[in-house]
Structures are given as structure tokens and as C-alpha cells.
From Swiss-Prot:
Organism encoding this protein: Lactococcus lactis subsp. cremoris (strain SK11)
GO molecular function, one term: ATP binding
All copies of domain Helicase C-terminal, residue ranges: 436-631
GO cellular component, one term: excinuclease repair complex
Gene assigned in the entry: uvrB
Protein name, UniProt field: UvrABC system protein B
Amino-acid positions noted as binding ATP in the UniProt annotation, renumbered to this chain: 45-52
Primary location: cytoplasm
Disulfide pairings: none
């Protein structure tokens, strides 16, 4: 039974802050552009300027159901937590891949190895996915924070909505009919272990545990063939929380189809099977034909008997009634037409949207070619980028460094540059590669005297190792952060850097999450003129931003300055005319386009920030951030005070106690959707266990 979406709910933004800096201007521009029907725009916001708050204000003022996309689960989890705080009275939902572990089905012909699909589903995330889709069909004040998994195939929203079991007090329906209806939408009867997606029966009382809940269920009480009343109950205690006048029970799976459609689908699957068997046999592929026939007939039998089978999504083209090559239904189809998309860190996220389709297709083609799947399985896939674009009604790309794709989509760019803390983008200068190490040693000593820290980023692992060894010989307290370092050790390194155990951190990629250190006042980028992933314009701007959390922030780009530019040389004259040069000690030297653009952008932002601070009497203050020991265990001494014990200094019994404590914290972090924290804690537990 279809349900009506409530459309008169309003977004209610709850915050103790008012827009600060240039947030107000950015919010006004974005809202005005949306109300004027602008399809695409970019919010180019410097790091630390409060872009999430701006996004929240835009959602509240436009009142549109909104999809916020992020490029990984960690970032999505952080955004979800922030939006939940801003909108406690609205539906803020979370939609990411529900697999804790996922090994996709695959076939490797070279070794004749078939890898069966193996996965572990996170029940909590599955619940949140169901909550997201049901909210989208019930109301309009919805924000869904999602990873790129939202462009993967999901069942038809029409079938999902049409399958809803709608119940009201006074409604004429027999108890047995309700039980049949619940089984039809993939609910399971379980009178003992009552959990999500189950129902239980006690005489004239049916209790239903929706797939989108984890604590509350509903008790439907019958009087003959009529519903007497419906009550919400707490599952654990059975306590009645109140009566409801309407209950919409959404299916326990997103892949739904009715009985008539199921028979049609099975007929199409059988026809496709017959056609594909003829192809295989005509090509002499008898093993592939036998394999396909056996597997598909088993699935058909399961579909007939149970309405479901393992890997049912591979038949989604037939289930949905789609034509070959037609895009699958996704989360985007559950939104009303007039919805808004916000892409966070768009320079990363849009790249993922582009790459998803090709990787998925290459794997599935192998399965189809060798008789593990019917060719229609190719249509169980993520959207292509152009298909994603066809769903866009209005979109806001959010990034400190928007990518080429976003810049091609729109000329409308709204800037947000002022940090509420008054902090400025750092001063950037170029120095010669010749003598760079001795120069850098001098700069490090200056910072060490002021109890400040230094980041040094190199291009190769060998250079990082050699540089670290040289610094140690020079008496500098230094450590090297490389990709092989485990979570526990990485956390210790960052903490030790902040505490001043050492002064310099050397690495190749210092852009990873969790390496923001307010004590860092100098970032040195070696080989800044070698174009590449971490030396392109965006990579340089992001690395330069590592010094933007300190009021003394300074960045040095070391570049090849072997030859000064000569105005009389035609080639040099061309470089001078292009502007891609820098001055050093009265001479002009060539720099790369990326260096020039990164330096110009940083200087432009800094000028705007300085002017704003001067006008409003703001003095930049280095961010004060508590230094915590993530691997310390606390225990009470005789005096009742807490003391910290280092994990490496513990005995086996103490380490066991620490593991127990960390496991509890890990579960709490996962429940709070702090997936990065939970993952770090998990890795710490594994490493502590390895000590024993």
C-alpha cells in the first residue's frame, strides 16, 4: 500500500553560533543562487572556515531534502554527527556500504580460481540504511549523509513503497492476513530471538520489529478480524511507550517485487538462460554451460519458493523490469524530484563517482564469460558519471581545492576564506635546491628554540630515510613517517611530536587524516618543482594548509634554481612574460605552473584574511588542542589520583586489561559512528595482542 509523504515539515537549525567571518555572505550567495534555479555551484572554502555550518544554513534556508556525499565512511560519519547536532528535530540519516568485510564474487581464469562472494554485514549500518529510505518516503525534512556507495544499485523505490504494510486501529484485516503480508515483505517469524526484520505472535497479538529500528517495536492487538490498537514498545523491557494511530511497515529488504512481477522476472531469467546456454554450446563451452545452468536453476527454485536467493541483486534488471543497459535504481531515486546534492571534498568524491563503473564491469564480465552469471548481471552496477549527472536537480560542490570536473560544470564560485579563529594562510617562499639541507637545518634550529615543530615532505622513500639519518647525525630530534607504520605507532609519533619528544617529522604524504598538528609552524616541501600527484596545484595547496593552524605558519618550497632567467634569452623571455617565475636575492628563477598558482592562491587568501582581521581587530591565535595519549591506560593510585602507564612498559596482565578497555571504547566509538576512532582502536587491540 502506497503512503503519502508529509511535505510541510521545516528544517530547524539548532546552533549557539551565528555566522562569522564571511560565512554569512557565502550562505546568502548560495541560497540566492539556489532560489534563482542555478543548477551547479562551487563553495570554495579554505580549511577551518566552518564549511559544514554553512552547508547546514543553506539546507535550513532552502528547505530542500538533501543528499550530502563524502568520499569515505570516516568523513561521512563525521559529517553525520555534525548534521545530527545541527538538526536534532529533523531526519538526519546515514547511508554507507553496510559491509564490515566484503570480498566480491570473482573469477581468475589464469589459475582457474573462483572466489565466492564473502561478506560480513554490519547490522547497525543496515538499520540506518533502512531508516534513510523509509524517511525519504515518509517526509521531506531529510538529510542523508552518504558515501559513494549511494550510486550502487538498490531496489525499485516504487516496488519498495508499494510493498509497505500500512496499519491503523479499526482497520479490518485478519491476523493471518497480516502474517502473510509480513512474510511477503521478507520479515521472518521468530518468537524467541526477537530482532530487526522479525515478528512474533502471541494469541491475538502480533509484535513487529521494523528493519529501521533497534530498540523500539510495535504491538498490534486484534479483536477478531479488526485491529483494536497499535502500541509502541521497548523491545528489551516490553514497556509500552504509547499508542500510534498509523503504522507503516517498510520491507525488510530493499530488493522487493510482487508475485506477478516475480513470475514475469523468472520467465525472463529462464529465457535469458536458454539463450546463453545456446551461445556457450555453440562455442563448445560445455563446462561453462553446465555451470550456468546448475547455478541459475538453483536460484530460480529459491526465488519461486522463498521470493529471494543469495545474490538476488544480480537479477535486478529482470526484477525491476529494466531494459538491457538501463541504469539501476539507486538511493537517488528515493529522493523527490526537487532535491539538492552537496558533494563534500568534491575533488576526491567526483573522481570516485567516475571510477566506480569501470572497476565493477571488468570483474563482472569475467564472471559472465565463464558461466558464473547471466549477462544481465552486468546491469547490477553503480551509475556511470553521466547517469549520476542526470539525477542532479541542484548541486553544490564543496572543496578547498575544486577539481577540473567541477570547474567545467559551473562558473558560479562562492568563496569562504575567513577563519573564525582569525588564523591566516601561511607565508610561502621559494628557495634554491642547492644547499637546501643546510638551509633547512638552520630553519629547524630556529623553530626548535621557540618550541615549535616542523614538517618536511619529500618525493621518495629513500630520500626520506637519508634525510632522517642526516638530521640525526646533526643532533636534530627527528622521526620518519612512512606507509608501513602501524596505527598504534603512528598515533604515538604524532603525540610525541606535539609533546616535543622530537621536533621534525619527515614523510612523503603528510595529507592523510589525523596529521593536523597546531604546533607545526614550518612546512618544508623538497623538490617542489617536480610535477606529480603531491606536487600539483591541489596537492601543494593542501600541504601548505598544514601550516595554517599556527599563527607563525611558514612554508618553504625548495626548487631548482641553477640558472637565473635572462631577459635577452628568447626562451627565458617567454617564461618571464608568462609570469611563472619567482625572485630570489635580486634574480628571477623559473617555477612550475602548479607552484605559481598555489602560491598566488595562498597569498590571495592571506591578504583577504589580514584585511578582515585588521578591520575587526582580530589577533590570530594558534589553535589550542589537547594532547591525549590514545594508548595509555589510567588507573587509580593509593592517593586516588590517576596516572598513565605506557603500553610497552606493561606486563601481560596489564596489557590484557588495556585490551579489554580498548575493546569497550571501540564498541562505544562504533555506536557513536566514529568509525575512524573505532578502526584505530581495533588496530591498537590487534597490535597489543601481538605483543603477547
Amino acid at each position: 500500500m502506497a503512503i503519502e509523504r508529509i511535505t510541510d515539515n521545516k528544517f530547524e537549525l539548532v546552533s549557539k553560533y551565528d555566522p562569522a567571518g564571511d560565512q554569512g555572505q557565502a550562505i546568502s550567495e548560495l541560497v540566492e543562487n539556489i532560489e534563482n534555479g542555478e543548477k551547479a555551484q562551487i563553495l570554495r572554502g579554505a580549511t577551518g572556515t566552518g564549511k559544514t555550518y554553512t552547508m547546514s544554513q543553506v539546507i535550513a534556508q532552502t528547505g530542500k531534502p538533501t543528499l550530502v556525499m563524502a568520499h569515505n565512511k570516516t568523513l561521512a560519519g563525521q559529517l553525520y554527527s555534525e548534521f545530527k547536532e545541527f538538526f536534532p528535530n529533523n531526519a538526519v540519516e546515514y547511508f554507507v556500504s553496510y559491509y564490515d568485510y566484503y570480498q566480491p564474487e570473482a573469477y581468475v581464469p589464469s589459475s582457474d580460481t573462483y572466489i565466492e562472494k564473502d561478506s560480513s554485514v554490519n547490522d547497525e549500518i543496515d538499520k540506518l540504511r533502512h531508516s534513510a529510505t523509509s524517511s525519504l518516503l515518509e517526509r521531506n525534512d531529510v538529510i542523508v549523509v552518504a558515501s559513494v556507495s549511494c550510486i550502487y544499485g538498490l531496489g525499485s523505490p516504487k516496488e519498495y513503497q508499494d510493498s509497505v504494510v500500512s496499519l491503523r486501529p479499526g482497520q479490518e484485516i485478519s491476523r493471518d492476513q497480516l502474517l502473510n503480508d509480513l512474510v511477503g515483505i521478507q520479515f521472518e517469524r521468530n518468537d524467541i530471538d526477537f530482532q530487526r526484520g522479525c515478528f512474533r505472535v502471541r494469541g491475538d497479538v502480533v509484535e513487529v520489529f521494523p528493519a529501521s529500528r533497534d530498540e523500539h517495536a510495535f504491538r498490534v492487538e486484534f479483536f477478531g478480524d479488526e485491529i483494536d490498537r497499535i502500541r509502541e514498545i521497548e523491545v528489551l523491557t516490553g514497556q509500552v511507550l504509547g499508542e500510534v494511530d498509523h503504522l507503516a511497515i517498510f520491507p525488510a529488504t530493499h530488493f522487493m517485487t510482487n508475485d506477478d512481477r516475480m513470475e514475469e522476472s523468472i520467465a525472463k531469467i529462464e529465457a535469458e538462460l536458454e539463450a546463453q546456454l545456446k551461445v556457450f554450446r555453440s562455442e563448445g563451452k560445455l563446462l561453462e554451460a553446465q555451470r550456468l545452468e546448475q547455478r541459475t536453476n538453483y536460484d530460480i527454485e529459491m526465488l519461486r519458493e522463498m521470493g529471494y536467493c543469495n545474490g538476488v541483486e544480480n537479477y535486478s534488471r529482470h526484477m525491476d523490469g529494466r531494459e538491457e543497459g538501463e541504469p539501476p535504481y539507486t538511493l537517488l531515486d528515493f529522493f523527490p524530484d526537487d532535491f539538492m546534492i552537496m558533494i563534500d571534498e568534491s575533488h576526491m568524491t567526483m573522481g570516485q563517482v567516475k571510477g566506480m563503473y569501470n572497476g565493477d564491469r571488468a570483474r563482472k564480465e569475467m564472471l559472465c564469460n565463464y558461466g558464473f552469471r547471466l549477462p544481465s548481471a552486468l546491469d547490477n552496477r553503480p551509475l556511470k558519471r553521466e547517469e549520476f549527472e542526470s539525477h542532479v536537480h541542484q548541486i553544490v560542490y564543496v572543496s578547498a581545492t575544486p577539481g577540473d570536473y567541477e570547474m567545467e560544470q559551473t562558473d558560479t564560485i562562492v568563496e569562504q576564506i575567513i577563519r573564525p579563529t582569525g588564523l591566516l594562510d601561511p607565508v610561502v617562499e621559494v628557495r634554491p635546491m642547492m644547499g637546501q639541507i643546510d638551509d633547512l637545518v638552520g630553519e629547524i634550529h630556529k623553530r626548535a628554540e621557540k618550541n615549535e615543530r616542523v614538517f618536511v615532505t619529500t618525493l621518495t622513500k629513500k630520500m626520506s630515510e637519508d634525510l632522517t639519518a642526516y638530521f640525526k647525525e646533526m643532533g636534530i630530534k627527528v622521526k620518519y613517517m612512512h606507509s608501513d607504520i602501524k596505527t598504534l605507532e603512528r598515533t604515538e609519533i604524532i603525540r610525541d611530536l606535539r609533546l616535543g619528544v622530537f621536533d621534525v617529522l619527515v614523510g612523503i604524504n603528510l595529507l592523510r587524516e589525523g596529521i593536523d598538528v597546531p604546533e607545526v609552524s614550518l612546512v618544508a616541501i623538497l623538490d617542489a618543482d617536480k610535477e606529480g600527484f603531491l606536487r600539483n596545484e591541489r596537492g601543494l595547496i593542501q600541504t601548505i594548509g598544514r601550516a595554517a593552524r599556527n599563527s607563525e605558519g611558514h612554508v618553504i618550497l625548495y626548487s631548482d634554481m641553477a640558472k637565473a632567467l635572462d631577459e635577452n634569452d628568447p626562451a627565458d623571455k617567454e617564461i618571464l612574460d608568462s609570469g611563472y617565475y619567482t625572485e630570489y636575492e635580486g634574480q628571477k628563477y623559473k617555477i612550475t605552473r602548479s607552484m605559481k598558482h598555489a602560491m598566488d592562491e595562498t597569498a590571495r587568501r592571506r591578504d583577504i584574511q589580514m584585511a578582515y582581521n585588521e578591520e575587526h581587530g582580530i589577533t590570530p591565535q594558534t589553535i589550542k588542542k589537547e594532547i591525549r595519549d590514545l594508548i595509555a591506560i589510567t588507573k587509580k593510585t593509593d592517593s586516588g589520583e590517576l596516572e598513565e602507564v605506557d603500553a610497552s612498559a606493561m606486563n601481560k596482565k596489564e596489557r590484557k586489561a588495556l585490551v579489554k578497555k580498548l575493546e569497550k571504547e571501540m564498541q562505544q566509538a562504533a555506536a557513536a559512528l566514529d568509525f575512524e576512532g573505532a578502526a584505530q582502536l581495533r588496530d591498537m587491540v590487534l597490535e597489543l595482542r601481538a605483543m603477547d
